[in-house]
């Protein structure tokens, strides 16, 4: 139902946020920002 849709959206948002944070962190470490 609605709850599983909300859960999926939240999971995807968390995944995207983690990806963004990871790429920001790695570019800072590599000084390529």
Curated annotation (Swiss-Prot):
Compartments, as annotated in UniProt: Secreted
Superkingdom assignment: Eukaryota
GO annotation terms (biological process): defense response to bacterium
Disulfide topology: 27-33
Family: Belongs to the frog skin active peptide (FSAP) family. Brevinin subfamily.
Role this protein plays: Has a non-hemolytic activity. Has a broad spectrum of activity against both Gram-positive and Gram-negative bacteria, fungi and protozoa.
Complexes and interactors: Monomer.
Name recorded for this polypeptide: Gaegurin-2
Organism the protein comes from: Glandirana rugosa (Japanese wrinkled frog)
Taxonomic classification: Eukaryota, Metazoa, Chordata, Craniata, Vertebrata
């Amino acid at each position: 139902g609605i709850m599983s849709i909300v859960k999926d959206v939240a999971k995807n948002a968390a995944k995207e946020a983690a990806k963004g944070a990871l790429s920001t962190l790695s570019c800072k470490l590599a000084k390529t920002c």
